[in-house]
Amino acid sequence: MRPATMTALGRGEPGRRTVLVGGVAAGAGLLIPRAYPGSGPTSADWAALRRTLSTHELSLPGERSYRRARELFDPRFDALHPAGIAYCGKPADVSACLSFAVRFRLPVRARSAGHSYAGWSSVTGGLIIDVSRMRHFSVGTGAVTVGAGTDLISFYSQLAAHGLAVPGGSCPTVGLAGLALGGGVGVLSRQYGLTSDNIEAVEIVTADGSVLTCDPASHSDLYWACRGGGGGNFGIATSFTLRTRRLREVVLFFLSWPWSQASRVVQAWQSWA
């Protein structure tokens, strides 16, 4: 039997309060239903999952690829040892991984570029659902659609080739998914808002394996939650549609001052800004 939070998300359009309760449950690991009889996945089970993935990329303990695959941006979390790292190339892969995790009651972590400073991109004994292979990019009218695995420098390079801009962060190797779902502060934020303010639609895979496109007209509460209402805890994002602006001349500058002048600088900055 699925828990109430998972059932609520699967019935269509949840209320905003239901969504928030679901987010708390997700953070506590309550979106995994009761385990099937038996122990954890066998070698045959892992092999079956590997065959299911469109990428056929699955890194397991003992394999040559595992050490590199489990590493995150921050070496503070090198002690984490996931049971497996699955590289997903399309939403159906994410659905398959979630089904696998439900079957064997494995903790799940989503990973784009692995920059989480809290270590939320990994977990010992769990399944890492890595979306870094999802890097598609297409330009529409006033918007772009981009895969959740795209890093910022790649995203900005693709935008610049079309003379476009989207407000975002300044670290080139940060993943777009974590940035957008967490807010996204950058040099264009004063003019155009946070990255999350510019999300027009997000494709996510929910805990029951459903692939949903969330926008103001469809699954609007989940759309609201993905734009700052829950830190990405309501599903695994696979694609974003983001509002674009025509690229204009941008002036960047850096200020430095002696510590003794910090109070005056802050006061002057507040008056100017």
Sequence positions of predicted segments:
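N-terminal secretory signal peptides
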Residues: 1-14
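Glycine-rich N-terminal segment of FAD-binding domains in flavoprotein oxidoreductases
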Residues: 61-64, 70-134, 148
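Short, structural beta-strand-to-alpha-helix junction motif
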Residues: 142-143, 150-157, 173-175
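Loop/turn elements at helix/coil->beta-strand transitions in domains of secreted/extracellular proteins
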Residues: 55, 103-107, 164, 233
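C-terminal segment of N-terminal export signals and the immediately downstream linker at the start
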Residues: 12, 31-62
